[in-house]
Amino acid sequence: MPGVLCEDNRLSTSRMTPPLVFEPLFMERVWGGRRLETLLGKRLEPGVRIGESWELVDREDAQSVVHEGPLRGLTLNELWTRQRAEVFGPGLGYAPRFPLLFKILDAQDRLSVQVHPPAAVAGRLGGEPKTEMWFILDALLDSDLYAGLKRGVTRADFEAALAAGSVAEKIHSFPIKAGDAMFIPSGRIHAIGAGNLIIEVQQNSDTTYRVFDWNRLGLDGQPRALHVAESLASIDFDDAEPVIAQPDGETVVACEFFRAERWTLDQPRISDGKGFAVFSVIEGTVRCGGREFARGAFFLLPANATDREIQPVTPGASVLRTTVPGQ
């Protein structure tokens, strides 16, 4: 089959052309807006409230596809399954899919109060665990986040508030600004407030249990489904009043699943290490592999890339660099 032979020839290339750029997948959401277009320059379907741009994803029902270059048209899963060591580097085991998922979230309205199940609970409920982090690209003056419970709130208090429709009063909330970050481990109840534009780095999972949705209707005009029993089984009721992530030098968040660093570039810098790195442009414009990337752009630098230099095009350009442990 000629198509298969062509694919095999491209995947057998000894040196990948850096960087790899993928087509974003835009998701309509009841809470979405248009800032992916107005602030980041992404082309959206007119009149649609886009809440999520999936920038890098390898799931059965959603695949990132290489946008340009010699590997154009190949999926992230094809690269992962057939050129894992070359593109992604050593030590990544035999997982069937790329382990992370990268999104941009545009919250014109509040997201639901929700939780992602810890691994032990996810297995019992038939879901997937999801630990994630948020990096705030842009926020309105009165924007806030919800994360964890207020101190002293018990499970009984929470269930009573659920019954009374006042659960938001039991959740810790705080103001937020551009440049802040928040770590959301599995089991932490959370919600994103209106006015936030957020980069989300997460485990490759799409399991979310909604516990409260602000009594609103979905895109179909009906109340969105809630998952109260699953949420109660997943919430860590000892998780009280977490704080905004406190950077350790350039490291914004480091956990067992990923490491995210903020680089502010006054001069060119080499991305070293044995494996791949995913770059998200936070401010300004950068250049890599002869291509320029503006705010909101994502690219994957392969493990076997020969040109690993990230250059600032505009003074003080800033990127979020995400890697996995051991690389």
Protein language model regions, located:
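Transition-metal
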Residues: 4-153, 213-237, 260, 326-327
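Short beta-strand segments in beta-sandwich/barrel cores
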Residues: 268-269, 284-288
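C-terminal amphipathic alpha-helical segment
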Residues: 207-276
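His/acidic/aromatic-lined binding-pocket segments of jelly-roll/cupin-type domains
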Residues: 102-103, 111, 132-135, 173-174, ...
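Ligand-binding loop in jelly-roll beta-barrel domains
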Residues: 97, 105-110, 118-119, 128-129, ...
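Loop-centered beta-sheet repeat module
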Residues: 161-206
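Short, basic/aromatic beta-hairpin or loop at an interaction surface
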Residues: 151-164, 272-280
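Short acidic-glycine-tyrosine-enriched beta hairpin
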Residues: 171-182, 289-305
